Design a protein with these regions (language model features):
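Hydrophobic and amphipathic membrane-targeting/association helices
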Residues: 1-183
Length: 183
């Protein structure tokens, strides 16, 4: 009895002081159209599929391939380097890094003292790419959930979880838009 009471108090205390986690989710149906060979070709080149080996067009639009596209470095990099809004110069990567206290950690390092993603993409160095790759790897493991709620249907769910509601919502929206424009 006493043990249950202590566990209940600890659980309540944990829930009260824990930062909330916000989830932004987009769920949609993958459409397979006819005569979209140009779209098929661009999608195929990214996920490494040889169109000559595919006899059925629907195999290319299998949601498993699209799940991998959502998790690809290229799509996530484009999303992270997007701006928070049209009139705001801050990139999503900067907001994410500030929220995770990564900016402070980077600026403590002498090599990264003046490091910023708020520069033109053409001026970004290998260091930017390396840091972005590390951030993306962690993000995919901890905060990005791409799933098929039902294996029999062509439905896809994209979720972004973060303690910053605005970041979660914006990143989810931007990622879905980028991938949908791509294919």
């Amino acid at each position: 009895m006493l043990g249950s009471l202590v566990i209940a108090i600890l659980r309540i205390t944990y829930e009260v002081f824990r930062d909330p986690i916000y989830t932004a989710e987009t769920t949609f149906i993958i459409e397979v159209g006819e005569g979209d060979m140009s779209q098929l070709g661009s999608l195929a080149s990214v996920v490494g599929i040889n169109l000559n080996n595919i006899s059925d067009e629907s195999q290319l639009f299998d949601t498993d391939h699209i799940v991998e596209l959502y998790k690809s470095y290229r799509m996530l990099k484009l999303a992270f380097l997007s701006r928070l809004s049209d009139d705001d110069s801050e990139r999503l990567i900067t907001r994410f890094a500030r929220g995770k206290k990564l900016l402070k950690r980077w600026h403590r390092d002498d090599e990264l003292k003046n490091f910023s993603f708020e520069i033109p993409e053409a001026d970004m160095s290998v260091k930017h790419d390396s840091i972005l790759m590390e951030v993306i790897d962690d993000f995919k493991k901890e905060q990005l959930i791409i799933a098929k709620p039902n294996r029999k249907l062509m439905i896809l769910s994209v979720k972004v979880e973060d303690d910053d509601a605005l970041f979660a919502e914006k990143f989810n929206t931007v990622l879905v838009k980028i991938v949908n424009q791509f294919y």
